[in-house]
Amino acid sequence: SDSVQKSKENSKNIEAQSKNNQDEEDLYSYNLIRSVFKPKSKEPQPDASSDDNDRSVDIGHQERLQNKIREELADYFVNPSKEEAERHMVWVEVPVWRLQDGKKVSDTERIQVLNVLASDVKEIFREIYNGHEKFPIKRLIGYTWRGQNSMSFHNTGRAIDINPEENPQMDIDGRVLVGKKWDPHGNPYSIKPNGDVVKAFRKRGWVWGEKFRKKDYMHFGFKEM
């Protein structure tokens, strides 16, 4: 019957949505969203190419930020909505390098993030700007409302996407879903493993989407402790 068919289609849609959300759930506890705040026992492990910056993470700094985030977003976690989320967002201006006619020139970029993370974000991009790579920024995406049922940390300004076209999101089989091609050795806009961008985020407790089962090279999110 039509009702049975619709039920099957709904089940498939729910299953597909669950799979799409699984990567962030693997790294960030589902309970954080539900205001229970019980971290999962398994933490993502550094890969073999990680260097001493992994061990330079200020755990106390992360814990203090997490406590501030939980307090700041307490109402949102109970009743998530776009209006509630946007009450906690701020715009920050950060220094960046642009590529113009093959040369790197200094500029600034504005990005909307969770107010509690604003200082961290400024420090991160100041460090990237001062790094030896002079990593060029074409586009930044911070806070983006993706629906009340979305698990994305972009909903609460705790995620940043960098140069999406050159740092694509992949499916589990390595096919590109968003963006074009990740080429860290040939494309200056592609994020390098253990480069200035990864180091600046990682040592402040942000997780790179390269760690996901479905790679998301553009993505950095402030992780749950």
Segments (PLM) and residue ranges:
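Long, low-complexity repeat tracts used as extracellular stalks/passenger repeats
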Residues: 4-33
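Stable alpha-helical elements in mature extracytoplasmic
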Residues: 29, 65, 117-124, 158, ...
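Active-site-adjacent loop/helix surface patches within enzyme catalytic domains
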Residues: 123-161, 165-169
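Catalytic cores and adjacent binding grooves of peptidoglycan-active enzymes
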Residues: 151, 156-225
